[in-house]
Amino acid sequence: MAKKSKALRAAIEKIDATKLYSVEEAVALAKETSFAKFDATVEVAYNLNIDVKKSDQQIRGAMVLPNGTGKTARVLVFAKGAKAEEATAAGADFVGSDELVAKINGGWLDFDVVIATPDMMAVVGRLGRVLGPRNLMPNPKTGTVTMDVTKAVEESKAGKVNYRADKAGNVHVPIGKVSFDTEKLVENFKALNSVIAAAKPAASKGAYITNLSVTTTMGPGVKVDSASF
């Protein structure tokens, strides 16, 4: 642990805490200061000037990053008949119905994304206590409750990410891995920022993005100038 603390201190020393970096500078610096022994995830953190207690100021959705996330998602689909066949053909890792509910209730969680056709939500609803806290519950807002199973599976496999503001207005989204070229991470970052900016509620007055930073797994945060996009 002491070694990690020393590495973190060394990384922090390379960052000017009083400076707002451009997108390109921030991403490059986040990569440079990553000290994990594995291919760390690069994550963007927003603090938004919104009141999530109000229904018209909730920020939630999904998007496909242009360069993916560097992780191949394991996709589970709740569907029957032709839609189950469609899900399998699209590349879903697991497809089924009640038998999957029993398996998940038994403690199995070897998947990253859950998709369901609307008619299956009564079945999936029985898993609310398991999937809900893990942000795995299918939702129309993220495109995971849909009849277009092919599109949902393909987007999940291509690098789809979900974003959602917490009670404090914070949004955390992965944009790739440290091993990515800086240009690809910047492109993903800019694509994400366009979506977050476009989601600004009409009721949000004043500065919308109050704090923005990029970091890596276990690494220090680098503040980003939101005006540099």
From Swiss-Prot:
InterPro entries: Ribosom_uL1_bac-type, Ribosomal_uL1, Ribosomal_uL1-like, Ribosomal_uL1/biogenesis, Ribosomal_uL1_3-a/b-sand, Ribosomal_uL1_CS. Gene3D superfamilies: 3.30.190.20, 3.40.50.790. GO terms for biological process: regulation of translation; translation. The keyword Transferase does not apply. The keyword Membrane does not apply. GO terms for molecular function: rRNA binding; structural constituent of ribosome; tRNA binding. PROSITE patterns: RIBOSOMAL_L1. Coiled coil: none annotated. One of its GO terms (cellular component) is large ribosomal subunit. CDD domains: Ribosomal_L1 (cd00403). Pfam families: Ribosomal_L1. Keywords: Repressor, Ribonucleoprotein, Ribosomal protein, RNA-binding, rRNA-binding, Translation regulation, tRNA-binding. Part of the 50S ribosomal subunit. Belongs to the universal ribosomal protein uL1 family. Binds directly to 23S rRNA. The L1 stalk is quite mobile in the ribosome, and is involved in E site tRNA release. Protein L1 is also a translational repressor protein, it controls the translation of the L11 operon by binding to its mRNA. PANTHER family: 54S RIBOSOMAL PROTEIN L1, MITOCHONDRIAL, LARGE RIBOSOMAL SUBUNIT PROTEIN UL1M. This is Large ribosomal subunit protein uL1. It comes from Lactococcus lactis subsp. lactis (strain IL1403) (Streptococcus lactis).
